[in-house]
Amino acid sequence: MKLTLIQPSVGKIANKPYIKSWTMEPLALATLAGLTPKEFEVELIDERIDPLPEFYNTDIVGITIETYTAKRAYSIAKEIRRQGIKVIMGGIHANLMPDEVIQHCDSMLLGGAEGGIWTQMLNDFKNNKLQKKYDANSYFKKELDHVTPRRDLYANKGYLPLGLVESGRGCPFTCEFCAI
């Protein structure tokens, strides 16, 4: 099976390429790829660098969504879903605006993907049981210590020569007013 992970660009200006923004490695997507079961072939498309294909040769797509890329992410998801491909969305905007995001995808992840929830989502997809929403707060997060981001997916993409590292993840508390 094939999983395609997409980092949307900020947007598009008429008759010009997509707006370029920071070209640092999308560490969240490489971490997600590291959490993906080995039976999935993983492809990374970073729209800030790569053109999007007209037709997708994949089984399922994951799109990371930040508030400033939301409009573009919804447009990408609409086209992919039109091709009959399931779309999963997650990221900070999904946590902040879940009622909005869920209208544009087949499944949504709230919170971080570690702790077994990402594997559960992909297994549910394989078994035709993909749920509309998954809440990572209901999963025990023990998997992160063993996650190696798939930096091989960055090859030949022209990212800034920086090695991004996460020194911490989230927060152990579940305050209702916080998006972390």
Which ranges hold each PLM region?
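Acidic, low-complexity intrinsically disordered segments
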Residues: 1-180
